[in-house]
Amino acid sequence: MLRSLVSSVTTGPTPEWAGRILMAFSGHISQQRGRRRTLTPAPWLPPVKESVPKSSVGISQGTKNLLETVIEKETLAASTIAFQNSQETNVSVVDIPDSSRRVGLVVRKIGMLPQWTNEGNRILCTVLEVDENHVVSITSPEAWYKSSAVGKRKAFNRHGPMWRVTVGAGNDDPTKYTLGYRRQFVRAGIPVKEKLGCFLVTEDALPSAGQPLDARHFGVGQYVTATGKTIDWGFQGGMHRWGMRGQPTRRTTKSHRRIGSVGSVGDARIWPGKRMPGHMGYEWRTVSGLEIVRINVDKQVIYVKGSVPGDIGETILLKDCLQEEKRLKSGPMPTWAPSLETIEEEPETEPEEGTIPKNLLFNEKFSPKLFRFTSPSILFTDADAKKATGRDKTKAKIAKVKK
């Protein structure tokens, strides 16, 4: 009867959902699960780092010093050229349509720090450092589709064709890496990067190869999405990994923290997906809807309200939030450039006593609701000054003698 009902609703071959219903009612269960996490890179990927650094194989100390000087000058020259190219790039602050996808930033989590609002409420923020981000390469959707299995899923999706933009972070010693890894940075004209991250970008928001990315790519008050690997806890038991209760504390011998029975009543096997002791953490996770409350321009540091996945020192991919009510409406396209910088002219006044001169402070951007520690915390009005002072409560009361 069920099969005839399904055939009356559908025409042609039986769809997948109908097959699941038939198997469920017939006593068979169709189990759906994802791919298992791996801790090592795929074997077909080329090596990134040299097994034996070239600087330690039969090279005298004088030659090493010469190579270090040449590498330092090449890195400085590449950074200078990239900065000059960024000044020539045409950028503007425009309204961003819902179909556009901008590039993101590869940041490093350096800790958590509390901030306070103007009302005195404490909010815990994550501090993220933008370390020398540059655009390494741009791959068209056609080339990405042909060359990668991931590109076959993401190059042409429901949002239209997507370009893969690779961003590098953190300048490093090129002698540590293989020739094949260094070639992509030579083509872009930038220093060798330690970390790489890829983003899906639409055609109207494509940056140029070798373009530097600044922390001001995001604005204060904007909502972002953070993706990273969770804290690596190593091999853990069922109580820590899955929150199981364990066995009774009394009348139990050496089984207090065991998970108990793992049988499936008749199958003579353990079902895939059974919660058991094993490796905990180090999984890719995404947290969306995080608000940026503060940006330190001089140190390239972003303060994000809330927590992000990963331990201190882990690499995080930061991009625009796509939630409907938290989507970016207006911003720099394709990214921020020095041509968008505006110098705010303030009247020259002598600093008040007890305040820090502005030339000694960092160039920072704050959310309007965030309290700045250079501002006074308590303001007294004339009405407060006219109030009668009360009794000194630190001293004992003394009865007045009647005359």
Curated annotation (Swiss-Prot):
Chain segments carrying region Disordered: 32-56
Subcellular localization, as worded in the UniProt entry: Mitochondrion
Record keyword Mitochondrion present: yes
Main location, first listed in the record: mitochondrion
Keywords: Mitochondrion, Ribonucleoprotein, Ribosomal protein
One Pfam match: Ribosomal_L3
Annotated GO biological process: translation
Any GO MF annotation of the entry: structural constituent of ribosome
GO cellular component terms listed in the entry, alphabetical order: mitochondrial large ribosomal subunit
Family stated for the protein in its record: Belongs to the universal ribosomal protein uL3 family.
Protein name in UniProt: Large ribosomal subunit protein uL3m
Organism encoding this protein: Caenorhabditis elegans
